[in-house]
Amino acid sequence: MGSIELKKVKKWFNEVNVIKSIDLKIYDGEFLVLVGPSGCGKSTLLRMIGGLEDTSMGDILIDGQVVTNFPPSKRGLSMVFQSYALYPHLTVEENMGFPLKTAGEKKNVIKNRVEKVAKVLKLEKYLNRLPKTLSGGQRQRVAIGRSIVRNPTAFLFDEPLSNLDAALRVDMRLELAKLHQELKATMIYVTHDQVEAMTLADRIVVLDSGSISQIGTPKNLYEMPQNLFVAQFIGSPKMNIIKFRDIYNSSNIDQELRDFLLTKKRVANIGIRPEHIKIVMNSKGHVKATIDVIEYLGADTYVIVNADTLGGVRIRCESNIKFERGLKIGLKFELSKIHFFDQEGINLNL
């Protein structure tokens, strides 16, 4: 078992309330990702679950037992940090087996468990090597292996891939996804990278200033953001947000779009993702625009256009279509994919 529940959890640092009454249930075997911008409280919340930070108010339960005041060693959890924190003078095998050694396990038990975990992480041929001879990705796998050998109730990951270069991060994301499928263990993962969140999570918790902004599957958050904050945070590149008054009063939009914009009341902003806009030639479509910037990314090309007072609108296109800067074009919106947000940022579509 590995279920974790937070009940009305709060955290203060002196007079500053950094975690604001969070209720959250993490299910046994779930891969849950805590995501949000810097300073949103995601790492603090993870450390509170692990017992590395005190909980000011509320309760933390692991498998139904209240552990709010338990020290980290009594919670049965294992943490992997951004820093590998390996002992440089110990071999890979000794590093991985260190938690079991300090717990007083027998040598044969330690050896068997380390070898089993090393096989899962493809570290068998590195067991006799020192950390300094390993790549960054291999060192992180050793750090993960050290947490696995303890057979914890759940794993807590605090931005474990942020020290790796872009290519290694992609590889390690795949390794973590495979590891979760194999272990079927509960994993709570903190990141500021929403791509990591989208590719790894069963569910994502989006945090904003110490509060939960939305919880849901990656698909749910991407397609049905509850508010403007989630709409702009989830997705790469982010959703185009246009002030309602700017687009409605623009002389560059056609009557079909103008009529559609009036189907909702109390609208302050509209949002539409880059893939839900198509470029049409001869300035036809819903909006007249001029190509300002072209970003070629291989399989996709992103075109940023200037459309009167609307600001820069980004469109995703296939790379086999050629465009030139300064070309006058039209934008065709997929009307059913437009999101309407009120003055408080609430999605009026939901």
Each language-model region and where it sits:
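Conserved coupling/switch loops of ABC nucleotide-binding domains, chiefly the family-specific signature
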Residues: 56-59, 109, 209, 338
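Conserved ABC transporter NBD signature motif
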Residues: 58-66
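Pre-Walker A (P-loop) beta-loop-beta motif of ABC nucleotide-binding domains
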Residues: 22-33
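ABC ATPase nucleotide-binding domains
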Residues: 72-229
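Helix-to-loop junction immediately C-terminal to a conserved catalytic motif
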Residues: 50
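Non-catalytic connector elements of ABC transporters
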Residues: 237, 248-350
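The feature captures the beta-strand-to-loop junction immediately N-terminal to the Walker
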Residues: 35-37
